[in-house]
Every structure is written in C-alpha cells, then in structure tokens.
Amino acid sequence: MNAGDTAFILLCAAFVFIMTPGLAFFYGGMVRRKNVGNTMMQCVFIMGVSVIMWVLVGYALSFGGNHAGIIGGAKWFGFNGVEMKPGPYADTIPNLAFAAFQMMFAMITPALITGSVAGRMKFKALVLFIILWSLIVYYPMAHMVWGEGGFLAEIGSVDFAGGNVVHITSGVSGLVLALTLGKRRGYDQGVYHVHNTPFVFLGAALLWFGWYGFNAGSALAANGLAAHAFMTTSVSAAAALVSWMLIEVFSEGKTTLVGASTGLVIGLVAITPGAGFVPMWAAVICGLLVSPICYFGVKLIKGKLKIDDALDAFGCHGIGGIWGGIATGLFGMTSINGVAKWNGLVFGETRLFVAQIIGILVYIAVAVVGSLICIAIVRIFTPLRVEERAEKVGLDVSEHGENAYPSFNGLD
C-alpha cells in the first residue's frame, strides 16, 4: 500500500461528498420558493439512505464478484470481508478506501434524478423509487463498467469517472419520471423563474470543487493520470462556461449567472467519461460543443416536445453524458490510459467508438426499463404525484410542514 495514494483517495472521496450538498443548493435555487425545502430535502435524504444501502448491499452488488457480467455477488454484504488491505481494484490503497470513494458516486447519482420531478412528486414515493432504482439500475450499471468481469468493460466500453454510469442513467431516468408524472400544474400558462440565483451559483461552485475529486480520484492514485484528469476537468468546464455565455449573448442579448453556472456544470458532465482518456485539446472541444448541444436540446425538450423536465436533469446530465461518451470514442488515446484498448475515431480506429455507442445504448435501455419497473412497484404502495392542493400550497408545507422562508405566505 501507499500512504500518499490512500490519503489522496480519501480526500477525493470527501470532495465527491460535497457534490451532493452542492447539488441541493443548485437545484434548490432553481425552484419556486414554496418548493425549495422539499427540493433540498430530496438530496439530504439520499445522503443518508445511500450510505446505508452501500454498506449493506450496494458495494457487494457493484464490485463483489461477478455474475454474468451484469451484477456482483454477496461476498461483501454488510462490508463483510472489506478490509484495510488492498482489494482487487487498486493495488496501493485499502479496499475500504476504494469502497468509500465509490460510495460517494452511489450518493450523487440518484440525487441528480430529483431535478426532473421538482414541485410535484410525493416525498415517500421518491424515497421508495430511489431505493429501488439504486438496486435495479445503478448497482448493475456500476458493475457492468467498473466491476470485475463487467459486460461493458469486456467489450471495451470505457467510462473514466462516471459520465455514463452516473449522468446518462440518472438523466434518462429523470426523463422517464417526468413523462410519467406529467407537467407541473399551470406549466403551459406560467413562466417559471429561478428564485435564488446566488444559491444556484453556490451549488455550481461546490459541484466544480467536488468534481476534481470525482475525476482526478478516479485514477485511484496520486499520479500523472490524476493530474491529467484534473486539468481536462478544468479545461472542459471553462470552455463550456464561456461557450454557454456566447450562446446567451447571440440568442438573448445578455449573459446570466444561471446560464454560466449551468454551462460549467455541463462542461464537467461532458468530460467525466473521458477525463482520463482524451488529450487536453480534445477537452476544449468537448466543453465548447456540449453547451450548444445541451442548450438546444433543452429548447427541444421543453419548447417543442413540451416535456416538463423541471430542472433539466435530462437536458444537462443525460444529453451531456451522451455527448461525453461519444467524445471519448472520438478522442480517446491508449497512450494516455491503457484501460482504453483502442484509440478514438479521429485517430483512425473504429472499435473504441463502436464500443462507446453500444455502451450508451445499454445505459439508456437499462435506465428506461429499470425506471419503469421501479415506478410500477412504487405505484403499488403510493401514488407518485401529490394532490392538486398540495402542489398549489407548495411541497415545503404539504410534505414537510416547514417553510424555507417563514415570512413568505404566497403561492409562488
């Protein structure tokens, strides 16, 4: 074992932990005042339940053995046998450190889904959905890509830090939930505004900070690959931020803090699958292109298709993750990271690109089917959506009996 690597991974795990509270601020600032507490509480409860599930069954199902390349096994249930010595996934850090790092991924991923259901989903229905979704969608997908003998890893599909496992699955599942729940009441008549711009930027800043642990830590050692991932993360986020601002200038005539915050987040999403595979110049391209892809993707989803993906979980994470997976297939280099078996399409090889496309289709299929199964099970026990009066009053009061702004008595 290496003490420096161990300290680095534990620190990165703490960085990734910060991302979930950051997401709570990011989402909380975007919703209406009557729903901010509920929106943030959705992230807070996941911080608790995801840790318990990970220790009891999640780590074992994701990384404990292999069954048909789809799911792990039972040998690490309850962290039984997860020791302070190195495990099968990293030679220089304890198995416990690797498990702690991956636990934070299992925390942030389901929290991303909540952006699609803001303002209209019963809290108890969401709790049950997230528990089932982690079991049916996230743990199998994590195993397929990162676990020993995982199906997608075997065919050569790569995902350095979760741009596909985390963002495609959560974004697509959010879209399925949004379609199932239907639009917020008055969605077609009203104009929804961000209620707290500083919250949005604070959340984006915490996400960017935590993302360094997310991507650099996925090197699983304090080495050159970690430094490379750190820099590609910085470059893509910066390029996407500037790109989004330029789009706003040309389309709206002005830049916005919310737009810049959104741009940097989708830049982080886009580089995540390829942070440890693509060269620095490709990170610039990845960030520059993800903003128009997501910007016009959101316009299509909300403007043309009239789908109420409330906080653009699919528009930003789903679409951004898909682009990131494709970009990895275009620009990946074996000389940067030998985990990639082949070079990307721009270097004259096709196999990595094909493997990435297959992987993306699998992520989407598993997320759609898995989410529909979860929804069907939840409906056995409780309706998904709050009643009309509860939605009008706001979910802060109707679901939690508290108000983020005690002096506020309106319906906005």
Predicted regions and their residues:
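Glycine- and aromatic-enriched membrane alpha-helices
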Residues: 1-412
